[in-house]
Regions:
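N-terminal cationic and glycine-rich segments that engage phosphates or anionic surfaces
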Residues: 1-124, 129-138
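Positively charged, low-complexity, intrinsically disordered RNA-binding extensions
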Residues: 138-237
């Protein structure tokens, strides 16, 4: 259904961001802590925590580390972490969204502005690029052909899908992510991955030299401790 491979582009971005393994653990723990603090420790009623734990498991974060993060969230009443989304521009005018968790907003803004300006970009105002993306849920189901997927279409509500070598990638409303995951699990169809992401409405094509600059910017933004996720409307696939 997809005109271009959104999954390939997402995987390229994730691979670049996941190269720093220690940072992946830190991010996973921080997201679990914030999710538990905001919504409580019960995953049946806290979908954000359920998703955070699922992502931590995918990154091989030890179970006891996950449990400690939840306990810390419940016991540390003084930890004042804010969840803030910043918007900006990179080289060639590409749009950049930076999702952050921070206990010092001024520090975070300063670090983001410094990295963006050093790499030919700038920090934008609220709403400057957010409209160029849409929030979507993504589910990867294994060992499922297109015909098999089509047989389930009456029972699930999808925005889009892609057929890949080892299964299917499903794009859905974020609010229906766990409902669809549960549907497939009840059918004994293995779900390997689920997440919520910001999907660019239109991708900008770039050459190899431009891609190197943009990946370098992404790496430097990832090195900022407060940054959780980075999204760009550029074709990296």
């Amino acid at each position: 259904m997809a005109g271009h491979s959104k999954w390939a582009n997402i995987q390229h971005r994730k691979k670049a961001q996941d190269n720093k393994r220690g940072k992946v653990f830190t991010k996973a723990i921080r997201e679990i802590t914030v999710a538990a603090k905001l919504g409580g420790p019960d995953i049946s009623s806290n979908s954000r925590l359920r998703l955070a734990i699922s992502k931590a498991n995918s990154s091989n974060v030890p179970k006891d580390t996950v449990e400690r993060a939840i306990k810390k969230a419940l016991g540390d009443k003084d930890q004042n972490i804010q969840e803030i989304t910043y918007e900006g521009y990179g080289p060639n005018g590409i749009a950049v969204i930076m999702e952050c968790l921070t206990n010092n907003k001024n520090r975070t803004v300063s670090e983001l502005r410094h990295v963006l300006s050093k790499h030919g970009g700038s920090l934008g105002t609220k709403g400057s690029v957010l409209h160029l993306f849409k929030k979507v849920g993504i589910i990867k189901v294994l060992d499922t052909t297109e015909d098999e997927l089509l047989s389930h279409m009456e029972n699930i509500d999808l925005i889009d899908f892609e057929i890949i070598k080892d299964g299917c990638i499903l794009f859905t409303d974020p609010n229906k992510l766990f409902e669809i995951k549960k549907y497939f699990e009840e059918k004994s169809i293995m779900v390997e991955n689920e997440e919520i992401t910001m999907d660019p409405i239109t991708l900008i094509n770039i050459d190899n030299m431009q891609q190197e600059k943009i990946l370098n910017l992404s790496d430097k933004l990832e090195e900022i401790d407060d940054v959780q996720n980075i999204y760009m409307n550029v074709n990296l696939g």
